[in-house]
Amino acid sequence: ASYRAIHDIREEERYYPDARAIDPDDLPQFDLLCGGFPCQAFSNAGRRKGFADARGTLFFEIARLAEAKRPRYLLLENVPGLLSHDHGKTFAAILSALDDLGYHVEWTVLNSKHFGVPQSRKRVFLICYLDPRCAGKILPVFGTDGKALIQVLGGSQGHRVYDPEGVA
């Protein structure tokens, strides 16, 4: 309640049990759409069925919302197996869909251990933007000094933060 009052937010958070049921007309305008579509369809630990797995098609729900709402930026995340799935055809289809929507895409693989997180977890990140003037200003991203988030923030800031030296 306090956060809503401070930031003049009049709407409650909304939770959708199924991304396919989201009506874009029910959403306010926004500048950034973040999505981590299910990775099981592309992961080495999964069966790697790709778009043949219903979970693998949820990227297209993100694309549907992006087409309807036209946010300036998209930030997408998945496992590195997405890059090589079906000999790169799956990733090419995703890039093509984003291009068809008018988004310029930069992507990279980052490992959480380079950003002060006490685990090694590689993920591919796609940063997509409508304005071509953003090109070259976003990536590459590097972990600067290996400090943990708790060391940078100087405390947990009201949330559980994991420190490489233990739970804070």
Per-range role (PLM):
Residues 1-20:
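SAM cofactor-binding core of SAM-dependent methyltransferases
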Residues 5, 35, 67-68:
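Solvent-exposed polar/charged
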Residues 15-17, 35-36, 62:
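Active-site-proximal cofactor/substrate-binding loop regions of enzyme domains
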Residues 22-30, 40-168:
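Class I S-adenosyl-L-methionine
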